[in-house]
């Protein structure tokens, strides 16, 4: 198989992977608010974090030990897609009578099987690139860019396309149909990807930890790896905050006569998509920054970028202050990529091959699992206090609190983490 061909196949995989997520991740909050679930938005995003505590690690172990990673990717996407379609169908058929319990249950099943696919897709890509004789640090970021392209295109699709009722998909259940269909396409496509062989069975008797792949947790014995994972969790608390509330926040300006006709207030998803455009460009900077500055400085840049991400949201509006929203979207690319992508590459470079899928799952557990769960729970408390339960809602106060949190995490990381040397083969 030619190097050009494998790159194209991995591009398609990444495109579909993130297109399925982009169809609803930033706009789901708007739909939930429209059906009366506004105060529970945090729970949906916390659930993403909760299932990421165990599902990525579990599926990573399965991929390392028993089932090739590309088949695990297919299985998970298939279940996720069917459950997401069921959630959309339930919302459509229930209309104004939609109940929280059934919809939340279907969403939970879908996200429980979707979240592991992010780390598994990375493992599939790294394995294929290494087989082709390529350096993942250099070759993966340009491929991963197309995942963000897919995310952007589905964001724009649900923003501009309207249903038979004349309402944009971003405000209705139609966004879940879009996501489910794309997941099923990837379910089929993943079966055509290069084989990722499981770890050969070791001779002799294995311990339970070795047999199940839990030995990835031995990384916590390394002080610097332990610090890295702890701060991955702390920074992971920031990841889903804007995904959960940015669309709802910007759309809320329509209730203010001064901004009711502002383009941004009426096209929140399109405005937010500038964040993903920035992400696309920033991915290309990662190889240079990782080689030049190392993981510590790259993650520090990400942490302080989150400060500006939240701060600009707090100060902006869709009218004369829309430029602050644009700046927030620009720094998002740095905030997200310099943490998520660089962290994943760091784990890949500094772990043994036999536990890499498990280690990627562990990274997901700390960031999108524990971090996102705690972060979205805390963010929900803040937003409910200052917005939904307040006599005079103050979104700005909530955003400034999030910015202050990111600043404190960045300062502590600068003090406690030392950039380790790259693992020698």
Region spans (language model):
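Helix-loop boundary and gating motifs at the non-cytosolic
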Residues: 1-53, 224-260, 267-271, 340
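Juxtamembrane intracellular "pre-TM" segments in multi-pass secondary transporters
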Residues: 1-4, 194-229, 255-260
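Multi-pass alpha-helical transporter architecture, strongest
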Residues: 9, 58, 86-92, 182-195, ...
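Central cavity-lining transmembrane alpha-helices of secondary-active solute carriers
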Residues: 42-64, 270-286
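Cytoplasmic membrane-interface "Motif A"-like loop-to-helix N-cap segments
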Residues: 64-79, 291-303
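C-terminal ends and interior cores of transmembrane alpha-helices
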Residues: 78-97, 304-319
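Cytoplasmic helix-loop-helix junction between adjacent transmembrane helices
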Residues: 108-146
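A membrane-interface helix-boundary motif in multi-pass transporters
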Residues: 160-181, 381-406
